[in-house]
Amino acid sequence: IKHIYSGKPILEIKNVSKFYNTSKNLFRNNKSFKALSQISLKLFKGETLGLIGESGSGKTTLSNTILKIHEFEKGEILFKGKDISKIKERELLEFRKNLQIIFQDPYASLNPLQNIFQIISEPIKFHRICLKNEVYEKCKELIADVGLNENFLSRYPHELSGGQRQRICIARAISVNPEVLICDESVSALDVSIQATVLNLLNLLKKKYNFTYIFISHDLSVVKYMSDKIIVLYNGKIVDYQDADLLFEKPKDNYTKKLIKASY
């Protein structure tokens, strides 16, 4: 693992804060709510960085901020050394291609009117990943990468199980050769037995393509299994940030201790 941290980080966040304005009414003035407070982290090529915290801790807000879905008020986010707040419109497509997300609910993130070939091929065509006459073969490769066969390309989302749908979401996400994959509660909607197979698949793909993961979950045991390092978020703040094994052995914060106790 040590060689992962020998180079420069692919993603660096420096003292980022994100505010939301709460609605004002007749009796109250407009107030701001700090969703992220002074967040700093480094993500290295080939690393899996776990983000753990309860609902409302700021996990998804942080991922949306990294993806430029949300703007942030303070701090700096560098992707491959470049400040993402200064990315120009023409560079945004390339930026978004390099950072892909796998969502929690695979059924909600798949178009029910499209078959699997259409779903996977759409981003390939949009980003011109390969020649037009190579698209079908590319989809065959991707479907094989996620442990399914070619017959699935003609099926529709409603014909698949939850685990199979999540595999399709993974195939679509990796179809554009991203550098960073954000897994946002990407196995929490699946049965426990299916979770393990999808987690193992993500690890296999990481080894094959040297992917870099940000793995977001409220399940500490899942995060420990996947991650090299773990960040614990509480009320928009980082309260713990260390190697996965060390975090369990020597948690720095009482909230981390409570999470560990609750996971057994």
Show the residue positions of the predicted features.
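Helix-to-loop junction immediately C-terminal to a conserved catalytic motif
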Residues: 67
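A short, surface-exposed alpha-helical micro-motif characterized by mixed small hydrophobic
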Residues: 223-225
